[in-house]
Amino acid sequence: RNFLLKFEAAQIYYTQCYDNQSRASRKHQANVRMARLYISHFIQVLNLAVLRDEIKPVHKELYGLPEANVVPDLLSEASLVEWGRKIIDGEQRRISQGGIPIYNPTIARVKVHYDIFLDSYERQKGYQSATNRSLDELASMRDRADELILDIWNQVEAKFQGINPNETRLEKCRDYGLVYYYRSNEKVKEESELSC
């Protein structure tokens, strides 16, 4: 009885964790899209400013960007975290050295969307961690649950093993909650016996 309460509580907790993670994921994906859009756009504007000779190519080193005018891969959330930080820090260093700020988008606007994404990213990692821990806890209880189910099953069948015919015995066991499923080859055998 005590195990059943713990198992049900673990099942409920896992479901809650999974639901929380799923709900937060929708909002998080919107934050990912906005951060990716602003970081990518800022890098494109920076590259165009370099092409127009408004910013020296050597200044791209402040951002950790290669001299080639390409946008780094921003598909993964980890790369967004990395490049967002590099772009924000690089722009602040360039401005502190006397450079003119890039507009449309401004680094302040990029930073706002990056910070929102970063908060959401950390929160989502927390939800994922809680879901994984709760699933591990539930999985660790499965063997004990299976043992209890098998023990109950065997006790119920042992109690009614002397009852004949077989269908009456199975009906008594069903009254105790046992559920029988016919295997595909058993169904064919039973149907062929009925047709004879």
What do these predicted ranges mean?
Residues 1-196:
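Basic/polar low-complexity intrinsically disordered segments
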